[in-house]
């Protein structure tokens, strides 16, 4: 009886150690670090769970903001004033997105941001890592602004295929709300 108890305790202890090690190994907070150096220099290092470096970058006078947004996903945002650029990093797969200027919303696979393209102000909805998978332009009579983020009041995904968008329209800056099927 005593042997069975000791054996059971050992098995439980080993399982607990394995679970703790597994959780630590796959804990996203162990995949990144931001160092503050001298003279307003900052260094960001982001690694995959296996330790392989995905990003190692320095910034001067811009403190990068690293956020854990999902089990395997981080964002790195850098900017000041009216313009901020956000990149998404999948630490499991080692994939890094392009930089999105003044991002206003995101889901698990899409991002929403304003952009001035082809002579028009647009709101772009696209796949985070590959615009060839999904890309959608929302073109309206937006309020005239120099910086696109000021025309957007609110944006959020209601589900995988529906976007709520509130923005300013026209010279009078009329508030408009839309539900957009993507």
Feature roles, as predicted:
Residues 41-57, 80-99, 122-145, 171-182:
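Surface-exposed loop/turn elements that mediate protein-protein interactions on large endomembrane-trafficking
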Residues 5-9, 84, 158:
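Generic structural microfeature
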Residues 29-36, 70-81, 108-117, 161-168:
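Short beta-strand elements that form the blades of beta-propeller/WD-repeat-like
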Residues 36-37, 68-69, 91, 105-106, ...:
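Generic beta-strand structural signal
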Residues 60-67, 98-110, 144-155:
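Repeated scaffold domains used in trafficking and secretory/extracellular systems
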Residues 1-14, 18-20:
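N-terminal Sec-pathway targeting helices
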Residues 150-156, 160-182:
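Long, ordered, amphipathic alpha-helical scaffolds
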Residues 19-79:
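Terminal domain-start segments
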């Amino acid at each position: 009886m005593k042997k069975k108890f000791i054996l059971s305790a050992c098995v439980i202890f080993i399982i607990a150690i394995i679970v703790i090690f597994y959780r630590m190994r796959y804990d996203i907070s162990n995949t990144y670090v931001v160092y503050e150096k001298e003279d307003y220099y900052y260094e960001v290092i982001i690694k995959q769970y296996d330790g392989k470096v995905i990003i190692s970058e320095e910034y001067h006078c811009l403190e990068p903001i690293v956020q854990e947004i999902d089990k395997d996903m981080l964002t790195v945002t850098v900017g000041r004033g009216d313009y901020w650029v956000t990149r998404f990093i999948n630490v499991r797969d080692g994939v890094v997105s392009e930089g999105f200027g003044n991002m206003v919303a995101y889901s698990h696979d899409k991002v929403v941001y304003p952009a001035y393209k082809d002579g028009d102000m647009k709101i772009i909805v696209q796949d985070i890592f590959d615009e060839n998978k999904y890309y959608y332009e929302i073109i309206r009579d937006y309020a005239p602004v120099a910086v696109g983020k000021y025309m957007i009041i609110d944006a959020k995904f209601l589900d995988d295929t529906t976007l709520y968008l509130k923005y300013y329209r026209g010279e009078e800056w009329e508030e408009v709300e839309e539900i957009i099927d993507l």
